Swiss-Prot record:
Mg(2+) binds at D73, D92. It is an enzyme of class 2 (transferase). It comes from Laribacter hongkongensis (strain HLHK9). Pathway: Cofactor biosynthesis; thiamine diphosphate biosynthesis; thiamine phosphate from 4-amino-2-methyl-5-diphosphomethylpyrimidine and 4-methyl-5-(2-phosphoethyl)-thiazole: step 1/1. GO terms for biological process: thiamine biosynthetic process; thiamine diphosphate biosynthetic process. Binds 1 Mg(2+) ion per subunit. This is Thiamine-phosphate synthase. One of its GO terms (cellular component) is cytoplasm. Belongs to the thiamine-phosphate synthase family.
Amino acid sequence: MKKMIDYSVYLVLDPELCGGLDGMLRVTEAAMAGGAGVVQLRAPQWKKRQWLDAARALQPLCRQGGAVFVVNDQVDVALAVGADGVHVGQQDLPVAVVRELMGPQALIGLSVNHAGQLAAVPSEADYLGLGPVFATSTKKDAAPVLGLAQLAGLAAATSLPTVGIGGIAPANAGAVFAAGVDGVAVVSAICTAADPAAVTRELYALKGHTA
């Protein structure tokens, strides 16, 4: 499964921006129609039961739409619903522990902000989220902004698939792809769009695809 993943447009769902669970389901369905290959549930303010209810609804929807479903940080929720993977940050559970819990077939992503973190990436990681590329308001505890030059340096220094994240929208996604990443992780530009499918399709086309 992991060999077939298209990271080009990686949707990160924010319940506040999407308008709750119903909005997240609507946005997910539209984004998959536009070419999104990975969908991540990220809801740091939520209680565990809310995570579980949302993941239970999103997992079959993503499977039906052909997208990989990833849960941010909450390994227990991912296991409970049979999610495809988990994405963790530098202060979350270690990747090796996540791999042990999730098993060999799970997709595991890790956030990276600088060369020191990149050098310490464990072998159990499958892909890296590099960022924030630009300033973002969707992550309150975001690390320092990378910019395109540092993004390119990090992407060139790893053999793992990479996804740029942080402040990415159609207006700047072309430059992010040009920096050498395999995909763009997008939150507000898709979640708040009047036509999420059209925005996703536009982002997808910037990498030279058609959906």
